[in-house]
C-alpha cells in the first residue's frame, strides 16, 4: 500500500517504524500531500500560501496474524488489524475528545478473504472567533461486512453545522450505504470496480445567503452504480441526484431527480487518463494544453471505438405551476479514425445518434412561455415606455399565440395534459416531432 501511495503524484507515504513479530506487526506511517510541488509546478508565488512544510498525518497500524489471532480478544481470521490516526497536529485547528484518535478503523480479514470492519470519527468542533466561524460535527460511525465477493458498508452521522458572519449551514441525519468489489488501495488509485452506493442527508437549511433568506432542502440523495463488462473491457457508470423538496426565495420544487448514465467507457482509456491526470498535476500550467493534445491523439480513438454513451435518463421536477419530465440519449457510433481537427462539428454530427423528449404540464409550459415572452418584450425599445401592468397584459395576450405558432411549426405537440417535444438525430439529420430541421453544421 505504501508503494501504491508513493506512485501518486502529490501523495507520499513514509514508514517511520516497523516491528514484526511472530503474532503481530506494528507500524507507523507518515502520509503527506506535496503542496510545495503543486505550487512550484503552477508558478504560484509561495509567499501567497505560507507553508513551512507539506501537511502530513501519522497513521498507526497494529495487526495480529491468524489463523488464530490474539489481540483485544481471541478470534479466527487471516489478520485482525487496527488503524488509528491520532491527528495531534490538527488539534490547533479542531477540537475533539483528547482520549480518542481523530480516526479509527478496526477490522478482520477472514480466512476466505472477506473483510469486516468498523470505523469511527469522533465529534468535532472548530472555532475562529476573529472570522466569526464555527463548525460542529456530531461524529461518524460506519460498519462493513462481507457478502459473497462484495463488501457491504453502512455509515451515519447525526449532524453537521457551519456558521459564519455571512451565512449558516445545518445538515441533519447523514448516512451512506455502499456495496463494492474492490479494496481501499484500488479505490485510492482510481481503479474502476463494480459498486453501488447511496448517500443521504435528511434535511439541509442554509440561512442568510441573502439577508433574511433561508433555503430548506428535504431528503437529498446521491446514488451511484458502476458495472464492469469484462468481456468488452468497458464500464457503465450511473449517477443520480434526488431531492424530495426544496423551498427558498424564488424556489419551490418537489420530486426533483437528475439521472446520468455514462456507458461503454473503455477501461484502458480510463486508466490512461488517470495516469495523465495524475502526472499533469506537476506539469507547469502553460504546458498542459500541449500535453492534453498528445494524450488525445494517443488514446481518444480507443474510447470512441467503444461507442460511448452519455444519457440523461431522468430529469424531472414538480413546480407550483406543474410538472415536467425529460430524457436525452446520445451515442457516438461508427468511428474508426479521428477527424482532421477535433473542432469539425460536421464530423461529430455524422457519427452522433441522439433522441430526447420533454413533456410539461400545460400551466407550466404557459408559465415558461410567458417568462420567455417577457424577456423578449423587455429587450425592445417600446418596453421602456410601458407600465408593468401593460407589459403583463401584452405577455398574456401574446403567449397563447406563440404556443400555437410553435405547435403549427411542429416544434411542440399538444397532449391531453400539456405539451411534449421529441428530438431525434441520426446520420447527420435531425427532426423535431417527426419534422426535419436543418442543422447549420450538418455535413454537405
Label the predicted regions:
Residues 2-444:
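Glycine-rich, small/hydroxylated-residue low-complexity segments
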Amino acid at each position: 500500500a505504501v508503494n501504491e501511495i508513493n506512485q501518486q503524484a502529490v501523495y507520499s507515504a513514509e514508514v517511520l517504524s516497523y516491528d514484526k513479530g511472530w503474532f503481530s506487526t506494528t507500524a507507523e506511517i507518515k502520509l503527506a500531500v506535496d503542496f510545495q510541488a503543486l505550487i512550484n509546478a503552477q508558478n504560484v508565488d509561495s509567499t501567497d500560501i505560507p507553508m513551512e512544510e507539506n501537511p502530513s498525518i501519522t497513521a498507526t497500524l497494529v495487526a495480529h496474524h491468524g489463523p488464530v489471532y490474539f489481540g483485544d480478544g481471541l478470534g479466527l481470521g487471516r489478520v485482525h488489524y487496527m488503524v488509528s490516526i491520532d491527528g495531534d497536529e490538527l488539534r490547533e485547528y479542531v477540537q475533539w475528545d483528547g482520549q480518542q484518535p481523530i480516526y479509527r478503523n478496526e477490522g478482520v480479514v477472514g480466512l476466505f478473504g472477506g473483510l469486516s470492519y468498523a470505523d469511527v470519527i469522533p465529534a468535532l468542533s472548530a472555532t475562529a472567533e476573529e472570522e466569526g466561524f464555527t463548525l460542529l460535527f456530531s461524529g461518524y460511525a460506519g460498519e462493513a461486512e462481507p457478502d459473497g465477493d462484495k463488501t457491504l458498508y453502512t455509515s451515519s452521522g447525526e449532524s453537521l453545522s457551519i456558521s459564519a458572519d455571512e451565512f449558516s449551514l445545518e445538515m441533519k441525519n447523514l448516512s451512506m450505504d455502499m456495496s463494492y468489489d474492490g479494496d481501499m488501495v484500488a479505490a485510492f488509485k482510481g481503479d474502476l470496480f463494480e459498486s453501488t452506493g447511496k448517500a443521504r442527508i435528511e434535511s439541509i437549511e442554509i440561512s442568510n445567503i441573502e439577508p433574511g433568506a433561508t433555503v430548506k432542502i428535504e431528503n437529498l440523495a446521491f446514488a451511484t452504480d458502476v458495472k464492469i463488462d469484462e468481456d468488452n473491457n468497458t464500464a457503465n457508470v450511473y449517477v443520480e441526484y434526488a431531492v424530495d423538496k426544496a423551498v427558498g426565495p424564488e424556489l419551490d420544487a418537489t420530486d426533483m431527480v437528475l439521472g446520468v448514465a455514462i456507458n461503454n467507457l473503455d477501461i484502458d482509456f480510463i486508466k490512461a487518463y488517470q495516469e495523465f491526470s495524475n502526472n499533469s498535476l506537476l506539469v507547469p500550467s502553460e504546458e498542459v494544453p500541449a500535453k492534453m493534445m498528445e494524450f488525445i491523439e494517443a488514446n481518444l480513438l480507443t474510447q470512441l471505438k467503444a461507442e460511448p454513451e452519455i444519457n440523461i435518463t431522468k430529469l424531472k421536477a414538480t413546480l407550483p405551476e406543474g410538472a415536467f419530465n425529460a430524457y436525452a440519449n446520445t451515442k457516438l457510433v461508427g468511428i474508426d479514425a479521428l477527424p482532421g481537427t477535433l473542432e469539425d462539428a460536421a464530423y461529430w454530427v455524422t457519427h452522433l445518434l441522439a433522441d430526447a423528449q420533454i413533456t410539461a404540464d400545460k400551466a407550466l409550459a404557459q408559465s415558461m412561455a410567458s417568462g420567455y415572452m417577457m424577456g423578449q418584450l423587455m429587450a425592445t425599445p417600446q418596453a421602456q415606455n410601458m407600465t408593468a401592468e401593460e407589459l403583463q397584459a401584452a405577455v398574456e395576450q401574446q403567449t397563447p399565440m406563440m404556443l400555437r405558432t410553435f405547435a403549427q411549426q411542429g416544434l411542440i405537440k399538444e397532449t391531453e395534459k400539456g405539451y411534449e417535444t421529441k428530438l431525434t438525430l441520426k446520420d447527420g439529420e435531425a427532426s423535431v416531432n417527426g419534422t426535419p430541421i436543418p442543422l447549420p453544421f450538418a455535413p454537405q
